Amino acid sequence: MQDPNEDTEWNDVLRAKGIIGPKAKEAEITEDQIQKLMDDAIQRRTDLPLNEGQRDKKIDDMSLDELDELEDSEDEAVLEQYRQRRIAEMRATAEKARFGSVREISGQDYVNEVTKAGEGIWVVLHLYANGVPLCALIHHHMQQLAVRFPQTKFVRSVATTCIPNFPEKNLPTIFIYHEGALRKQYIGPLELRGDKLTAEELEFMLGQAGAVPTEITEDPRPQIRDKMLADLEDKSSDFY
């Protein structure tokens, strides 16, 4: 019996007369199916089992050169699709990771650099004054974090150039912006733990605001007990 899906003039006539139905469409391959075909191809080449966790680690961590080495005539199309997807992902990551350092800005730069930073951009602004040790400490920590989180824009400015007559007692100050809107602020030594603040603690604080994708989930800052409660407990212990 002739295949009704075969491309022949006779079948075209039968379809035109309504005697046979339209040619069945080829099933579209899904991304999951592409992933499965690719995993099967790689497994045949490496002879290593790929479970769900291993697949994510082994495939997604491959460089473009490693993907090139896996290509052969049978699997070239599948691997090429994945290769193009990886290129797109790398380009997207590179586009986001465009900062990587602490930039010095002036009051004139404030609007363009902070409030008009762009869609999806987090900005961490450090207001400082020269000669203030705590400001130097914050700057040191921010330099480390800027390298680790290049998708976040870290800037600093002499406080009085952005806000005239800004009180030095309120330094250092950190403002956190997202898409031009102020999301969080830390004003003065007390809120920033003075000279006890560590880079890990600052990372956690910025992460809580959403400014950096930190993996720190527990607050590393020491828990300070309420002084009044502690005094009451000390006094009550005198009776025993």
Swiss-Prot record:
Q: Which domain of life is it from?
A: Eukaryota
UniProt keywords (A-Z) are: Apoptosis, Cytoplasm, Phosphoprotein
- Where in this chain does the record put each Phosducin domain? 54-214
Region named Thioredoxin fold: 99-240
- Which InterPro entries does the record associate with it? Phosducin-like_chap/apop_reg, Phosducin_thioredoxin-like_dom, Thioredoxin-like_sf
* Pfam families in UniProt: Phosducin
What GO MF annotations does this protein's record show? protein folding chaperone
Recorded GO CC terms: cytoplasm; cytosol; endoplasmic reticulum
GO biological process terms, alphabetically, are: apoptotic process; chaperone-mediated protein folding; protein folding
Q: Which residues carry this modification: Phosphoserine?
A: 63, 73
Q: What does this protein do?
A: Modulates the activation of caspases during apoptosis.
Q: What's the family?
A: Belongs to the phosducin family.
Report what the protein is called. Phosducin-like protein 2
Which source organism?
Drosophila melanogaster (Fruit fly)
